């Protein structure tokens, strides 16, 4: 049984993230979506909210589970018995950072492989940062996130679609 971990902050969980989960879940026996605490970032949603959002979106995948974690990814991977770390590469600009991270993970976890997946064409430009910025300004994010995530964003920002004003 091959277990993989797909780690990230998922702030918020986008259609691009789901695209990678869908595809990775077809490759591995079990896929664990690891929602990272990320103390160096200032997340828009709290860890518990990000876990709940990801579970709402991914609940229909029988071989996918969502768990939060803090600390080192290597410890989370070991705890879950994973043999593969899945990472997404949207653009060439992601490659340098992800390549360095894969090298460090190989050093820390020599028996664990990193697998890069590129998103489907329609999701290559989506990033959580862009989605948050659009949502905060009251823009339409429905093409980038699932309806449940859009609801979370509207509740968090107090913005109505397209108005740029608070409700």
Swiss-Prot record:
Binding site for ATP: 9-10, 17, 88-90, 98, 123-129
InterPro entries: Cyt_trans-like, PPAT, Rossmann-like_a/b/a_fold
GO cellular component: cytoplasm
Site entry: Transition state stabilizer: 17
GO molecular function: ATP binding; pantetheine-phosphate adenylyltransferase activity
Primary residence: cytoplasm
EC primary class: transferase
Protein known as: Phosphopantetheine adenylyltransferase
Protein source organism: Ralstonia pickettii (strain 12J)
Gene that specifies this protein: coaD
